[in-house]
Amino acid sequence: MTIILASQSASRKAMLEAAGVPFEARSSNVDEASIKRELIAVSGCEVASVLAEAKALPVSLAAPGRMVLGGDSLVEVCGRQFDKPVSRENAAEHLEFFSGKEMHLHSAAVLMRDGRVVWKTCELAKLRVRTLSPEFIQSYLDREWPAVSGCVGVFRIEALGVQLFDQIEGSHFTVLGMPLMALLGALRAEGELPS
């Protein structure tokens, strides 16, 4: 069966393609900022899960009987949650703040059918950002901007972003933006993939 990915994320598409999951992608056009404003004092995993559901819901309602996958990732550093950078200058500010600290990356996924959640999860990866010099930050952004403008942590781990870190704990797929192993198990359990 072909699932619907309620996202245009290149990383999520690439993971599903590489794993052999038949899918089509549709945008959900959810106003993430307005949803986040209402989620005061909520953990990173909870925020990512709410956003994943919000992205999947309109697509699920528009595709009766189909399995819809929503996903979201959220970065927290020192208890502060970060959005995608809005400019190169904002990206540099994020990287300066991240320098020498532990980043928590929450990646959530939800499966919906007919507007109802049939499965959801959120996984955590911990990434230790090395101390970044101002020169490195500018050189990094010279090479990676605007490609990282759509990335909450201002990095693509599969590219130059790997140089930001000293240590990573957690699934590589979680760092890429989707708890893929758990998702594959759920798709098999729901009959969307052969077991």
Curated annotation (Swiss-Prot):
It catalyses: a ribonucleoside 5'-triphosphate + H2O = a ribonucleoside 5'-phosphate + diphosphate + H(+); a 2'-deoxyribonucleoside 5'-triphosphate + H2O = a 2'-deoxyribonucleoside 5'-phosphate + diphosphate + H(+). Belongs to the Maf family. Pfam families: Maf. The keyword Lyase does not apply. CDD domains: Maf. It is found in: Cytoplasm. The active site is at 72 (proton acceptor). GO terms for molecular function: nucleoside triphosphate diphosphatase activity. Disulfide bonds: none annotated. This is Nucleoside triphosphate pyrophosphatase. Its cofactor is a divalent metal cation. GO terms for biological process: nucleotide metabolic process. Nucleoside triphosphate pyrophosphatase. May have a dual role in cell division arrest and in preventing the incorporation of modified nucleotides into cellular nucleic acids. Keywords: Cytoplasm, Hydrolase, Nucleotide metabolism. SUPFAM superfamilies: ITPase-like. It is an enzyme of class 3 (hydrolase). InterPro entries: ITPase-like_fam, Maf-like.
